[in-house]
Amino acid sequence: MDGTVLVADDDRTIRTVLTQALTRAGCKVHATASLMTLMRWVEEGKGDLVISDVVMPDGNGLEALPRIARERPGLPVIVISAQNTIMTAIQAAEADAYDYLPKPFDLPDLMKRAARALELKRRAQVVPKVIETSRPEGTDLPLVGRTAAMQALYRLVARVMNADLPVMIMGESGTGKSLIAKAIHDFSDRRTLPFVVAQAADLLGADGPSSLLARVKGGSLVFDEVGDYDDETQGRIVRMLDALPDPAPRIMATTQVDLGALMEAGRFRQDLYYRLGGVTLAVPALRERVEDIPLLAEHFLGRAERDGLGMRRFSAEAMGLVRAYAWPGNVRQLENTVRRLVVTASEEEITRTEVEFVLGNQPAVDALRGAGGEGEKLSASIARHLRRYFDLHGGNLPPPGLYDRILAEMEAPLIEIALDATGGNQAKCADLLGINRNTLRKKITDLDIQVTRRRKLM
């Protein structure tokens, strides 16, 4: 790969790592900690690719993107950011970024994206511009996460916002499927038009479909949990989709079951399956992105405070239990639990005992044992969860990096429980696990595990 890359980041380590990697790959690199310097280089005509952080000492990288597009149309910009929310991904797409990666990023992945961007630049292919939209006021979506699966989902959501393809959103109950559909609508060029969520009952009667179309008026129409619809209702949807008015609404659907399997079993119409499956978004269950649980819990604490329920924080032990819990009801259950804890906690700091009481004192190891019963082997439980994970992606593969994600989700609860059993004594924990103490320390840091020392009662 060749070309000149402009790197802007106030973190010296990131500048050094990117400079070394890009130079070894054959690129020339100009690196700076200043957004002003970056813009001067752009205006001088330097660079075939920009890699920029968002929060800089002298400005916001996202706010500079429209200016870069005006000065140098077709100059690709890869945004890197520690602000790991769907809002950042959407803002990057709205601002005409070529790509977006969260921190900490995977260096080989970033290098591949940089190589593709430089190749597109050489071919003089200008990246299509996403129609700019204003963000709705008061948006507070619980779509928070730094895991690879969620970041891949954010990028895909940003790409499909203004594409008129049907969208199928798959995921377990409580994962936030309807919120994702609402985000796609709210940040699209249909945001001023109605957003209508339809249940099976809304399609009953001779005028059911026509009434729905009259309500949606060219906005966004979502068929909620479409896998539960009977054959007659499915047929009504097919006939409605075959005779959509002009302007036609954006069609989306949500499901917590594998529609492909239902279709093969003869329980879901093939013609409807292909009409709804333009783009499939797979929303991971909360137990499949354990690293995001503390982020979400803190997010819901902040929302509860803004709602006037009071200011609370989790103790380290309480957060450890929250993170280790299975959360069968996913994000919805987590939010309801946090709000209940905010209301019932006796002090500003929420204790482990209070969390145990609200959760019904379910042992954290249930998250590993799963639903297979007391006698199920751990390997069988893992195999069952992995099969479910692949099924939720339909005919698509999960995001890259599955091996590391699965290992991280296994390691985190194992180390947390071992630390709890040894009273937070890292030397004893390392001995219990059979690993080097330095290795344990590195894993604690990498997995963002909270360690609390306490005296063990003998």
From Swiss-Prot:
Ranges of residues in domain Sigma-54 factor interaction: 143-343
InterPro entries in the cross-refs: AAA+_ATPase, CheY-like_superfamily, Homeodomain-like_sf, HTH_Fis, P-loop_NTPase, Sig_transdc_resp-reg_receiver, Sigma_54_int, Sigma_54_int_dom_ATP-bd_1
Chain positions recorded as ATP binding sites: 171-178
GO cellular component: cytoplasm
Biological process according to GO: nitrogen fixation; phosphorelay signal transduction system; regulation of DNA-templated transcription
Superkingdom of origin organism: Bacteria
Keyword Transcription listed: yes
Pfam families for the chain: HTH_8, Response_reg, Sigma54_activ_2
Record-annotated DNA-binding residue ranges: 426-445
Keyword Ribosomal protein: no
Residues the record lists as 4-aspartylphosphate modifications: 53
Keyword set, alphabetical order: Activator, ATP-binding, Cytoplasm, DNA-binding, Nitrogen fixation, Nucleotide-binding, Phosphoprotein, Repressor, Transcription, Transcription regulation, Two-component regulatory system
Listed SMART domains: AAA, REC
A molecular function (GO) term: ATP binding
Cell compartment(s), UniProt: Cytoplasm
Reported modifications of this chain: Phosphorylated and dephosphorylated by NtrB.
Domain Response regulatory: 4-118
Function: Member of the two-component regulatory system NtrB/NtrC, which controls expression of the nitrogen-regulated (ntr) genes in response to nitrogen limitation. Phosphorylated NtrC binds directly to DNA and stimulates the formation of open promoter-sigma54-RNA polymerase complexes.
Name of this protein: DNA-binding transcriptional regulator NtrC
